[in-house]
Amino acid sequence: MKTEIYKLSAAELSSLYEEKSLSPIEATSSIINRIKDVDKKINAYVFIDEESAMKQAKESEIRWKNGSQKSPIDGVPTAIKDLLYTKGWPTLRGSKTISPNKEWNDDAPVTARLKEAGSVIIGKTTTPEFGHRGTTQSPLTGVTRNPWNLERTSGGSSGGSSSSVAAGMGPLAIGTDGGGSVRIPCAYTGLFGIKPTFGKIPAWPLSPFGTIANVGPMTRTVKDGAMLFAQISRPDWRDWHADSSMDSN
């Protein structure tokens, strides 16, 4: 393959999976190796769960071989901002006040939708403390840097997600946006990202910012953004604001 695997878009990965010329295991291994190579300088991830990611990738590979893939993003490595619950993992929110030993028993709606779609969830990305900053630096993780220029910020508060995607540490990432926390980092790192209409992507627990804060996709291409949006915009019973009337496809 001429293009290095970690540089491929989600749409390209999905197409190669379908052709059986690339496997989710190969893609996930490439992304994990990329994280190990470059994230010490960038600091986009709070943590990765390599064992879990490879297990998810193996399960996805079986589905693609059997023609029973769950969605176009089945087997595609994905990162989640560390403000959003992921079952079995801590959600530290960039703060030293939260115990790293506290694992959550529930998935946020967006995490649940990603798992239902078969996405390979790699790990959690950095955020300023409780998301209350326009740059991504916190007492817990320090400074997250822009992969295009390590002396520059990647913006905030979803700067970990934007840096991970821009640096090839995964083609898909999830951010949250109240006053620009998806849009600013995407602008700073050359990505596609949107703050969706309130209620289009379900959220739980509800944000302290009320109707201002939304969950949004962060990707290198518009096509990838549309693929991701279609999966995470499915309704969830825990969010009574969520709109189930619109077609995401």
Indicate residue ranges for each PLM-predicted region:
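Short, solvent-exposed loop/turn segments at the edges of secondary structure
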Residues: 88, 156-159, 186-189, 196, ...
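Glycine/threonine-rich beta-strand-loop-alpha-helix active-site module
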Residues: 178-204
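A short helix-breaking turn/cap at a secondary-structure junction
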Residues: 195-249
